[in-house]
Amino acid sequence: MLGNITPVSFFKTWVLKKTDVHVMISAREVFPCFIFRVFLLFQVFSRVHTLTNHANFEFEKSLSSCDKPCYNGVCLNKACVCSKGWYGSQCDHCFGRIRISDNASYISDGPLDYSPSAKCTWLIEPENSATPLKIRINSFFTECGWDYLYIYDGDSVYGKQLAALCGEQPSQEFTAASGKALVHFFSDLAINLNGFNVSYESNRCAYNCSNHGSCLNGKCDCEDGYKGLNCEYQVCQLSGKSTESPCHEGQCVDGRCECLSARVHGETCQMPVSSSVWDLIHPTNNAPTGKASHASIAIDDVVWSIGGEFFDGSSDPNNIDVYNVTSRIWSKVEVSGDMPKPRFDHTVVKYKNKLYMFGGVTKTQVRHQTTQAATNELWIFDMGSKKWAQQIHKNETIIAAPFAVAGHSAHVIRSEMFVIFGYNPLFGFMHHVQIYNFETEEWTVANTSDHVYGRFKHSAVEYTTPTGATAILVYGGSMWNNTITDSLMQFDTSTKKWSNLPQSGVQLYLHAAAYLNGLMVVVGGRGSNVTAGSKSECFSNMVQSYDVACKQWSNMSTAPVDLKRFGHSVHVIGQKLYALGGFNGKMKSDVWTLSPAKCSSATRPDECRLITDGTKCVFVDSSCVPFDPTVSYKSSFASMIKSSTPKSFDECTNTPLRLALKTCEEQTDCVSCASKSGCGWCSSGEQCLPNEQECVDGPGMLTSWEKCPQRNSVATMRPCNMENNCGSCRISPHCTWYPIDKASPCVSKEDLSPAFFLVHSRRKGKNRDPNQYQAADMSRVPRAAAFNSLAVVYEYETKSVLADRNKFLSPSHFPSFFRNATECPMPCAQRNNCSDCTDLEQCMWCPSTNRCINLEAYTLSFAYGQCHSWVTSGSGSVINRVCQAESVVCEEHKTCGECQRDPGCGWLADDSKTGLGLCIRGTSTGPLEPKPENSTWYFIDCPACQCNGHSTCFTSVGSFPPVTIEKCQSCQNHTTGAHCERCAPGFYGDARNGGVCSPCDCHHQADMCDPVSGQCFCKTKGVTGDRCDKCEAKYVGNPRNGTPCFYELAVDFIFTFKLRSDDKDNHTSEIYLYSVPYKKDTDVTFQISCESPKGNALVALNMTSSYVNGLADKSQAMMVDTICDSKGFRRVYVASDKGYPFGPDSNTTFFVRVYNFNTPVQIVVSFAQSPPINWVLFFVIFAACFIVLLVVAGLLWMIKVRIEAYRRNQRRIDEIEHMASRPFASTKMELSMLSQFSSAGGPTPLSIEPCSNYRAGVFTLAVRLPTGGKAVTPSGTSGLAVASSLCLLTPQQVGVLQAQDNGESNSGRKSNFRNLLRLTIRQRPNNND
């Protein structure tokens, strides 16, 4: 490492390297010359030693002056100078290619977390490369599914691929039989983790053959009694029981362990029968190449494995591998006739004597490139004739089955094949259940009203329900938005209905499941993606079981670590479960078997219940037996007599969840379910569940009966917000796609307003970009109108989608459908190149597979590291350059550095020493194609300078430190840059590798253009276009002919131009204006100001005019190079001057040019024509107006006074009349002496005021005040008072007081009062009675 050398040794090393050349040359010369050169060499060494001693202190100081350590480099001038293959401020990130020739060493991404977008390649070529190479993974932790370390056996990627490691990997070893290895690391932009540390050692096999064999030609030659790739498994050879036998409690019989006791089982009789046991099966012959995502099926005691994903360099992927579990022999089926394309993520089922293979992702090799595509092909394999035949579909519409799917599951029920879910590149995650009838050869879609989400790479098993129907259990899988689910659902094949079952609590996909002893056993899988703060398992070895009868999940005994994998398959044969293949960073071909626990090992009921590993037991008749769902078990006699009420047998453990589930399942409708405490209604499956659970899909759980739908309501349509793909949204007749709403782009047509049909009719017939959404230009339209517009634009016409399926599948026919019929953007799957793919934001281009996919489908499509890099719309501003740089077509790379970032390419440089060359496929030894003459192959390093054919390399040596400097001399052909890799200012093109730089074609309207695309940076405001050949709106001119674009300034208006430092105005440095004064004999005032933080501007003003009297046109410069600042200036041009003829007859025009400014700038400019003011006339008019104003004001004031007086008098009259209309009367009172007694019998009221209801009234009476025992009241005090009281009225009083008719005079009221008084007097009681 350079970081460990001393300054002196570094200096001496450089001198020795330089002198080696002279020594080799001197060997060919005569002896005297040699002596002379030795003398000079001695003088050089002496001088070097002296310089080193003097400079040692300063050099050491410079090396130690960096703030942070330089891990893979040296510190010079307070900065780290990195060694080859490293970069970063601390030389802590790997970069480019490195060749390692040591017999034993290590490689690493760096001491810290690896960098984003890393591409690092190590070529391990030990000196002893003729012997096998052992590669050991010491530590490894990267982002699961995104950041991979690829290991190849050989000196290039064209050798056999050994691994594609990601996630968290255990310590493991590999053997490169060729003695060489190429290791390539790729990371993306998102998450950066600890990385890896890998060591290697030459002349070793992996694990040293477990010390039970010898390494021969890269393979372990095992000793007797040991097998395996690394001799890691001991097998029995000698018959009978032996101390050296691997059989723990058994003996060897015909090469296998035969257990001597019924209490143990397993491959080596190592486990008691009360527990399940996993065993690795050692096949009798060599296993085939490892693979994953294959399709397999168990027929009798044979497993057929078809297709799958393989590593590069593996055997023929079309092979059909067959494994016999009884004989433990692998074999291949010889197939004749037509062959289907290689594929993975497909399914295979058996009906009668034929195998049916449907769907998956096909792989096509075209010119060293692999193209992948999802398919809906159905192939039939005749097991008798060993021939394939493709079944041609009868449906001719793309919106009918069969849909192309991958990652689905298939099940044979009676004479039909049920295809569950899967991913379709056009419609996303399919929620449909496709049904194929073997007899009629017709495809249909199950008509179900339940609303569920589609899934990818779930697991599914079929079983027979207690009612005799066949149901399919579907567990886990990946859904839209990269969501992994732990849900379990059941599909009834008779009623075509979905129902919800308890979740497992573990999110998995790419797992496998089988039905064993009443249990759904789920093995392995891939968990959630790794994030920066968590360590979720990328490869799982978890084994779960779901009790179908009890509806309970449980975890089985811990499986071996070697079982961590995904993409495998499992089958049940002879009461055992077999797991085959899969991926855990390596493609696996091993076979594991699960031997479930045996019920007979239990003797007590409690022991019987505890046996749950791979089986389900019940204690009946004093014995523990396997549970059979078709048998009705009864309770024992002892348990019956102990209880007052006999109970039926319950084989399940009554957990709180199960009790709640049992209670809720008794409710059959929404109202009763929601009314039950602790229960909720799932409308998607019309099922009642405990509210601790969740509805699998569709709307949320209903826990209030008031929210339940009506009993007689029609089944609801699938909610539009459950569709997350434009294609799936469009095939729903009640939905439409609204891309502006990012949260829920699929909306119901019922929510749209009919107010936008007019808008659509105006748009109809206009040219539209078919690749863009039709709502992209509706930002100014109200939301309701925009909704309806999309309803019209996206109106689905069934006639438009009728097309021959073969034509539809071709790329040339597909765009017309999606552009004209559904108005959806072209799907990612139909974009066939990088630039088209990245035009759509949600698309991602994978160069290594030549495939464009949706962002949400990346981890689904490339679960095994098939994508070595990817490009999206956010990868860079010049997307074409990024696409070119990431291409796997070597010939598209233009420089040596870019070429070597692709591990499959090398640089073939010509011998002109100018940097010209060709990037082609090759290995470290040379190109794969024939090498042309006069060329040199570079696989690790690059030629000096790399001047791209525009210069030659110049070499010089620095004074101190003595570092060789190689640089390009003056670049020619209008190029610039350290390697002449860019076009010089004023030119554009691709200067790399001899490219041509052309002058910017900007019609003299720009000084510079984009050096790559040639897009002109127009310097004149108002000029636009890639070639500055058009004028913007409101500007006039013809830039093509050299005439700039002018903006007209209307007279007597102020104009403000704000030019910002953005992409639009960043290069603007001038603006042209003009104004036409239309008033004759009126002065013209020109005013302008220029405010900019980057300096002042200059102004030029010209005036042109033509005379009506026949004189020639006249043009004169009014000002030139006049400085314009923030204060501005003002000029007045007098109309009386003969040189300024204004008015329509003279056709005078002012032309203004504001130039030499830098943005941002604000320009305020105006032309004004105001006639001179006649002050006498002004004051006369002003005085007249003022007098008129006073007169009018006086008149208005007088009118106001008159009106107010009239209103005041009128109000007074009304008040007097109102007071006069009040009831009043006079009365005479006779005061008797105190000693006298009145014969009248009592007082009479002075007045009576009846209430509104005439039932009571206020009686007012005169009251004599007390005198205090004297004859009269004291002097100054009144002797009388008026008192009032509320009293009831008699009928007679009411009759007198009743209100009279309208029109009765006020005098009548007074007479009524008198009558009342007389009535009161008559009714006074007689005291004599």
Swiss-Prot record:
Subcellular location: Membrane
Glycan attachment positions: 103, 197, 208, 324, 395, 447, 481, 529, 555, 820, 832-833, 934, 973, 1066, 1102, 1147
Disulfide bonding pattern of the chain: 66-75, 70-80, 82-91, 94-120, 144-166, 205-215, 209-220, 222-231, 236-252, 247-257, 259-269, 945-953, 947-968, 971-980, 983-997, 1000-1009, 1002-1016, 1018-1028, 1031-1045
KW Transmembrane (keyword) present: yes
Classification via SUPFAM superfamilies: EGF/Laminin, Kelch motif, Spermadhesin, CUB domain
Residue ranges of domain CUB in the record: 94-203
Listed GO biological process terms: animal organ morphogenesis; tissue development
Membrane topology listed for this record: Single-pass type I membrane protein
Entry keywords, A to Z: Disulfide bond, EGF-like domain, Glycoprotein, Kelch repeat, Laminin EGF-like domain, Membrane, Repeat, Signal, Transmembrane, Transmembrane helix
Transmembrane segments: 1176-1196
Kelch repeats: 302-353, 355-408, 416-463, 471-518, 520-575, 577-619
GO (cellular component) term, any one: membrane
Domain Laminin EGF-like: 945-999, 1000-1047
Residue ranges occupied by any EGF-like domain in the UniProt entry: 65-92, 204-232, 235-270, 952-998
InterPro entries: Beta-prop_ATRN-MKLN-like, CUB_dom, EGF-like_dom, GBD_ATRN, Kelch-typ_b-propeller, LE_dom, LMN_ATRN_NET-like_EGF, LZTR1/Attractin
Topology Cytoplasmic: residue spans: 1197-1329
Protein name: Putative protein tag-53
Gene that encodes the chain: tag-53
